[in-house]
């Protein structure tokens, strides 16, 4: 198979993919939990995009790159290049001295590194102080860069916590309400309980649900959002404005400002919990930020105009970063290099 891909032709306008190539493309796209995408349509979109580029300038850069290995598949598709207002070098910086780990901190104690990425708090009991009052002892679960975790809360709600994220809840969870605080990104499959509303607090908004599946992303200095997969939720902004969401909708907010609701394909937003990077028509700056967070590597845009290049990008999170860089270098209208814990785009 490796020999076949070494012979892979990049001139997509002259032929359609073979049956085996279509199969690998489906694998790369990663849609195993629902019907496979229309590979022919994807191929035609790619060919159309290539046809809009000057052949002499982009012949070596505009291509589909595929690599099939025992447990690694990457798929990158160059879609569009939009002008932007950046005129200086831009960078996302790695965190020095970081270790890849998941920690659990009980109340004000010292964080404890756990050896598993699957945590079970379903046996957590409510405690009282000497006066017989319910305590509010905190439990904090934190993931470092390059690590994610799955946990079961006391009521049976399942949470996936993405890299560099934190979730906090107290012993009072489930008494009247089920409340958690999230920084970073988390996906929830909420146990249905109409008597105890489920509430997620972030620095930018509060989400209230009864029983549903949704994704919350609230990293510092990034656009925050809620993506609803099923059920119904109520999102309240920092200024008190409220939006009711239906399945297949996303609510975005910039630094806790005005919220905007629109329809979206929820699939790309939740694939991280299944071990994939999945971006669809996403600016290269956002993609590189996520890669930098996962691999804890510096990202430097020597050519800031590349930040708004849109890509369709899929890769397993176990993929070697060097392979990802090689694939990006083949498709963007520029150059990508890696060395000394730094990826440079120019």
Located regions from the model:
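A short, acidic loop/turn at secondary-structure junctions
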Residues: 10-46
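Propeptide (latency) domains of metzincin metalloproteases
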Residues: 227-228
């Amino acid at each position: 198979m490796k020999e076949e891909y070494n012979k892979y032709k990049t001139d997509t306008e002259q032929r359609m993919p073979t049956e085996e190539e279509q199969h690998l493309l489906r694998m790369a796209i990663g849609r195993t939990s629902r019907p496979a995408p229309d590979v022919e349509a994807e191929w035609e979109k790619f060919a159309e995009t290539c046809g809009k580029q000057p052949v002499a300038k982009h012949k070596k850069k505009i291509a589909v790159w595929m690599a099939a290995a025992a447990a690694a598949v990457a798929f990158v598709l160059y879609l569009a290049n939009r002008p932007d207002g950046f005129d200086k070098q831009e960078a996302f910086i790695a965190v020095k001295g970081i270790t890849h780990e998941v920690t659990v901190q009980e109340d004000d104690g010292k964080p404890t590194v756990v050896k598993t990425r699957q945590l079970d708090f379903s046996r957590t009991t409510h405690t009282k102080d000497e006066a017989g009052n319910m305590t509010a002892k905190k439990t904090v679960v934190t993931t470092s860069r390059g690590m994610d975790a799955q946990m079961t809360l006391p009521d049976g709600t399942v949470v996936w916590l993405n890299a560099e994220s934190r979730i906090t809840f107290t012993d009072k969870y489930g008494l009247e309400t089920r409340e958690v605080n999230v920084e970073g990104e988390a996906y929830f499959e909420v146990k249905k309980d109409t008597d105890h509303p489920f509430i997620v607090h972030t620095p930018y908004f509060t989400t209230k649900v009864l029983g549903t599946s949704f994704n919350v992303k609230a990293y510092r200095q990034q656009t925050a959002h809620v993506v609803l997969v099923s059920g119904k939720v109520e999102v309240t902004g920092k200024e008190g404005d409220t939006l009711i969401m239906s399945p297949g909708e996303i609510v975005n907010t910039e630094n806790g400002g005005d919220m905007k609701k629109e329809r979206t394909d929820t699939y790309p937003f939740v694939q991280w919990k299944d071990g994939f990077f999945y971006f669809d028509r996403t600016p290269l700056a956002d993609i590189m930020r996520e890669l930098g967070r996962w691999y804890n590597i510096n990202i430097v845009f020597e050519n800031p105009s590349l930040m708004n290049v849109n890509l369709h990008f899929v890769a397993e999170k176990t993929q070697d970063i060097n392979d990802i860089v090689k694939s990006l270098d083949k498709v963007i209208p520029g150059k990508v290099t890696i060395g000394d814990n730094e990826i440079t785009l120019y």
